[in-house]
Regions:
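N-terminal auxiliary "cap/dimerization" subdomain that precedes the catalytic jelly-roll/cupin core
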Residues: 1-50, 81-82
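Localized chelating/binding microdomains
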Residues: 3, 10-14, 20-21, 91, ...
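Short strand-connecting beta-turns/loops that link adjacent beta-strands
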Residues: 10, 125, 138, 197-198
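Soluble, non-transmembrane catalytic domains of enzymes that act on hydrophobic metabolites at membranes
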Residues: 25, 189-192
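Short, flexible active-site-proximal loops enriched in glycine and acidic residues
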Residues: 30-33, 55-60, 99-100
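Hydrophobic alpha-helical segments and helix pairs
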Residues: 44-91
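Catalytic core of non-heme Fe(II) oxygenases with the double-stranded beta-helix
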Residues: 68-76, 85-180, 186-187
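Ligand-binding loop in jelly-roll beta-barrel domains
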Residues: 192-200
């Protein structure tokens, strides 16, 4: 459910991407909300109180939307390469695959400042690609529970155990700047632990 390619981005390109983001940092939209693992913020009172869909956690992060990127953006260039599309298709064993058409989120930068956190959740898409640009001073560890649910089996009991702190299924992935992560998040519960320090 999770694969990492270390040093996928060359140091020169990594530096350009970091500079690109810093130059537009004032355009980053930061938001806070409480969500359940299914990315919903509304409570369903028809369910039992301890149902996973009724367990909410704080989320705090921000995005530099894709439509704000300059035409010569290094990240935009990478995203639009046919070679990358073919490579990812081969990695996940799905063909054909398509780029996300959303002009705001297709290759957005995800920013987490001090106290930033992404709580336990499932993704709405089958898989995602992430590139680590910069590590925080402390925290920001990617944790995941591989294939804890599947098609036709939500496995609510096991999901609930993780939400209440059980660590038996939890794995950690320590990413370094320049690493590419290919992650199947639709069926794998995952989170990013709280960021500490002044480095976003």
């Amino acid at each position: 459910s999770c694969s990492t390619i270390p040093n996928f981005i060359l140091p020169k390109s990594l530096k350009i991407m970091n500079t690109e983001l810093k130059q537009q940092i004032n355009e980053v939209y930061m938001s806070r909300e409480s969500i359940n693992p299914y990315l919903n913020s509304k409570d369903d009172t028809s369910l039992e109180k301890d149902h996973p869909k009724r367990i909410f956690s704080k989320r705090y992060n921000g995005y530099l939307n894709s439509d704000l990127f300059k035409k010569d953006s290094e990240m935009k260039f990478l995203y639009e390469q046919e070679e990358l599309l073919k490579f990812v298709s081969a990695c996940v064993g799905i063909s054909p695959i398509y780029r996300w058409a959303d002009p705001l989120a297709c290759h957005a930068y995800n920013i987490m400042k001090s106290d930033g956190i992404l709580p336990w959740h499932f993704d709405s898409c089958e898989f995602t690609l992430s590139i680590m640009l910069q590590k925080p001073e402390k925290g920001g560890i990617f944790e995941y529970c591989p294939n804890i649910r599947g098609p036709g089996n939500e496995n609510f009991d096991q999901v609930k155990k993780v939400l209440y702190g059980e660590r038996k299924r939890v794995r950690q992935l320590k990413l370094e700047p320049g690493d590419l992560q290919i992650f199947k998040g639709r069926f794998t519960l995952h989170r990013v632990t709280k960021i500490e320090g002044n480095r976003s």
